[in-house]
Structure formats: C-alpha cells, structure tokens
Amino acid sequence: MTIKAILTDIEGTTSAVSFVFDVLFPYAARHLPDFVREHAGEPEVAAQLAAVRAESGEADADVERAIAILLQWIAEDRKATPLKALQGMVWAQGYRDGQLKGHVYPDAVQALREWKARGLDLYVYSSGSIQAQKLIFGCSEAGDLGPLFSGYFDTTSGPKRESASYARIAGAIGLPAAEILFLSDVVQELDAARDAGMRTLGLAREGGSLDGHPTVASFADIVVE
C-alpha cells in the first residue's frame, strides 16, 4: 500500500534526546514548584493536582506534598500524565518568555516540509504531552513548524510500547494502519506499531540498526513511496 501519512516520535527521532533531558526536564524541575504554588487555585492546574493525588494514592496531599510527588516522578522519569501536563504548562511559559526554543534536526525540518508539500499528512506521537509537542515544533529554532502537522498524540492514546495504541491512532487518523509509516528510535515502539499493521522505519542517529526494522541515520536517507 502507498504511504499516505507519517507518524513520528520526537526524542531521538526529530529532536535530540539531549534537548529533552539536558534542557527541558531541568527547566521544568527548576520552575515547576513556584509555578504550581502560584497557579494552584486555577482550574487547569487544580485539575492536574487532583490527578496527582489520585495517581499517587495520597488523597489528602496538600500543594507542597503534591510538588514533592511531582519532583519524585521527574527524578524517576515517570511518564505520569498529570506531570506531563504540568511540565507542558511550565514549558509554555518558558517558550512565551523566549527562554526556550525547540530543537528539531535540520534534516527532519527539510524532510517534513518536503513530505507536507507532497501531500502527505504528518502526525506526532510522543510520551510528552500534546501541549509540549506543539511547543517544540511551534517555537522551534527553525521557526513555527506547527502548520506542517495534522495532529498530535500522547500517552492519552495509550503506552507507546503497546500495539493497541497504534491501532487506536490509526483509527483516529482515519487510514488503514498499512498506509501509515511510523518513525522512532526505540525498537519496542517500532515492534508495537508493526504489530498494529503500520509500516516502520528506525532512526539510529549514532549509527547501527534497530532489530527487525529498516534503519536510517538521518531523515535525509528516508525514501517514502
């Protein structure tokens, strides 16, 4: 089947893992406590704090305890949805203030633009919140790349290493899974996408291969047919 849509991961694929771990995560860890204290009474933040209490099993946690739980989750690199949402809010403020610029590899920028011009639909699937995804591409070093994408998916669609998540995403996109190409640097994610019927391509930017999947080192090496 002809590829009609491309679904891409972010970390290690379109963007450097170091940007997320060396820039975004430390920025959120530094600014999240004060952000939560300042905005705890606002509905959007209050809803996420309620989710923190529910997920941690600490129904009576006050704001300071909730902050401590969030910082612990950051230290554990836990993919908790309320943490991702609050990190996204902190990053949004940082992008608005000009303190952050999203990193996207130049080869990815060029390929994404070319694919869009050819009429391919582009989508993102990342463990980072949809809000955070939009910020990385919308406030990137290459400018606003947001208009290139037709949609974004995060952990609300399911874990990235489970095939059901990819079947769900294919349904949301409205195409047979076989007409969607998934790009990632993680074998288990590629396996899950393949099990759901998607075409897969691995990104190994430092060289090497991703077992069981065609692998390239750069978006410049990707041929979409």
Curated annotation (Swiss-Prot):
Catalytic reaction(s) noted: 5-methylsulfanyl-2,3-dioxopentyl phosphate + H2O = 1,2-dihydroxy-5-(methylsulfanyl)pent-1-en-3-one + phosphate
EC number: 3.1.3.77
An example molecular function term from Gene Ontology annotations: 2,3-diketo-5-methylthiopentyl-1-phosphate enolase activity
Domain of life: Bacteria
UniProt cross-references to Pfam families, sorted A to Z: Hydrolase
Pathway as given in its UniProt record: Amino-acid biosynthesis; L-methionine biosynthesis via salvage pathway; L-methionine from S-methyl-5-thio-alpha-D-ribose 1-phosphate: step 3/6; Amino-acid biosynthesis; L-methionine biosynthesis via salvage pathway; L-methionine from S-methyl-5-thio-alpha-D-ribose 1-phosphate: step 4/6
Keyword annotations of the record: Amino-acid biosynthesis, Hydrolase, Magnesium, Metal-binding, Methionine biosynthesis
4Fe-4S is among the record's keywords: no
Record-level GO BP terms: L-methionine salvage from methylthioadenosine
Keyword Protein transport listed: no
Note accompanying the cofactor annotation: Binds 1 Mg(2+) ion per subunit.
Cofactor needs: Mg(2+)
Listed SUPFAM superfamilies: HAD-like
Enzyme class: hydrolase
Family: Belongs to the HAD-like hydrolase superfamily. MasA/MtnC family.
PANTHER family: ENOLASE-PHOSPHATASE E1
NCBIfam families: enolase-ppase (TIGR01691)
Subunit structure: Monomer.
Annotated function: Bifunctional enzyme that catalyzes the enolization of 2,3-diketo-5-methylthiopentyl-1-phosphate (DK-MTP-1-P) into the intermediate 2-hydroxy-3-keto-5-methylthiopentenyl-1-phosphate (HK-MTPenyl-1-P), which is then dephosphorylated to form the acireductone 1,2-dihydroxy-3-keto-5-methylthiopentene (DHK-MTPene).
Protein name: Enolase-phosphatase E1
